[in-house]
Design a protein with these regions (language model features):
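Membrane-cytosol interface segments of multi-pass membrane proteins
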Residues: 1-168, 270-272, 279-282, 302-344
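Juxtamembrane membrane-interface segments at transmembrane alpha-helix termini
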Residues: 55-56, 170-176, 206-209, 227-231, ...
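C-terminal ends of transmembrane alpha-helices
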Residues: 29-37, 166-180, 224-237, 292-294
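Transmembrane alpha-helix boundary/anchor motif
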Residues: 59, 140, 195, 199, ...
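Membrane-interface helix caps and helix-loop-helix hairpins in membrane proteins
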Residues: 38-44, 121-129, 173-185, 234-244, ...
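Short glycine/serine- and small hydrophobic-enriched flexible loop segments
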Residues: 62-66, 146, 198, 202, ...
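Alpha-helical transmembrane segments and terminal signal-anchor/GPI-anchor hydrophobic tails
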Residues: 184-193, 202-285, 289-297, 303-313
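Loop-centered beta-sheet repeat module
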Residues: 158-203
Length: 344
């Protein structure tokens, strides 16, 4: 097979923190554009969309493959990962649902608990923290995905079969239980991104060369996403199914990740990398905090569609995340530290 010069998948690992930073910034901008009536917002949605989400999930799957390759202990894996996610989620979700459900909307303590434990998401479609629900579910299945792709043999065939099953399940749920599917569609349609991330993780870990099929698939998927997104958001023509945009966006993410990594390598700007890494380091916290604040500010008379309000909210979210990240890192180290052996 033809190789794209000497380019290997390891470039994604080298620029992983930068890509995390770019992904979360693009998500924050996307969430503003969803509410804005500006023409530029529609163009952004069509050309960029929520591509930061599949980038984030692909990078997460890739990172988990590295982590388990270096330390195959399931106990250590779950301890570290769950602590890393659950500590910030517990803090943000408790405050969010207490303020929103109990204080502002007066729904009571039961609704508060349902919100924190994702019951409202699955039953009512309250999708504020759907991303965390997906991450936790993917953690459960990750060891199986790791074993599936670890050997490197027939991995592309395995990937195709697995993705076909996932897509088929999406269609079946859509037809069988449309209301329930509507509640969790945003989560279900992102599962392929994580699976692809684990698949790519094996290639990154073993520094495999990037071959031409990668570019063909990514270009076709990216082109399909932009076409259908432009038709929907600019021309007002709905695609046959929203899944075309969701899955096309996943392939578009593959294209952007590789292109951005190559550009970042060529530019090699320490300043730019520091900025990207700054946001990348707090990407999980920033995702949770900004969607929480965005939701609450609308309920108290400060619509997030207002650019000034949104900018203030983002600045506040970054400040909160800075402190939250420090606490999270401290707690994670304390809770995951191995006990020191006492000399006999």
């Amino acid at each position: 097979m033809m190789e794209t010069n000497a380019l290997t998948y390891s470039v994604l690992s080298k620029r992983r923190n930068d890509l995390f930073g770019i992904s979360i910034v693009s998500i924050v901008i996307f969430h503003y554009c969803l509410l804005s009536k500006l023409a530029a917002a529609k163009v952004y949605i069509a050309l960029v969309g929520s591509v930061g989400v599949p980038i984030f999930l692909i990078l997460s799957g890739m990172g988990l493959f590295f982590s388990m390759s270096r330390n195959p202990s399931l106990k250590d894996f779950y301890k570290k990962r769950l602590v890393r996610v659950l500590i910030p989620y517990a803090i943000v979700s408790v405050v969010h649902f207490l303020v929103r459900y109990v204080i502002i909307e007066g729904k009571g303590f039961v609704a508060f608990l349902k919100g924190v434990f994702f019951v409202e998401f699955f039953t009512q479609g309250d999708s504020q923290f759907w991303f965390i629900a997906l991450v936790l579910i993917m953690y459960v299945f990750f060891p199986l995905l790791f074993k599936l792709f670890k050997s490197g043999k027939y991995n592309f065939l395995k990937l195709c079969i697995l993705l076909a099953v996932v897509v088929a399940c999406n269609f079946l749920l859509m037809k069988a239980v449309p209301k329930f599917y509507g509640n969790i569609e945003v989560m279900l349609t992102r599962i392929p991104s994580f699976i692809i991330g684990v698949y790519i993780g094996e290639k990154v870990y073993n520094k495999r060369p990037v071959q031409w099929p990668y570019w063909v698939i990514a270009l076709i998927g990216g082109g399909a996403f932009i076409y259908f997104a432009l038709m929907r958001n600019v021309a007002g023509v709905k695609p046959p199914t929203s899944l075309l945009i969701r899955y096309g966006e996943t392939l578009y993410a593959l294209l952007l990740m590789m292109v951005l990594s190559i550009v970042l390598e060529a530019v090699n700007s320490k300043g730019l990398s520091k900025v990207c890494a700054f946001f990348g380091g707090m990407s999980l916290e920033l995702y949770m905090v900004h969607v929480s604040l965005r939701s609450i500010m609308g309920l108290i008379g400060f619509p997030a569609s207002n650019a000034l309000y949104y900018a203030i909210m983002v600045a506040l979210a970054i400040g909160i995340c800075f402190g939250l990240q420090k606490f999270d890192n401290f707690a994670t180290k304390k809770l995951t530290a191995k006990p020191k052996k006492v000399a006999k």
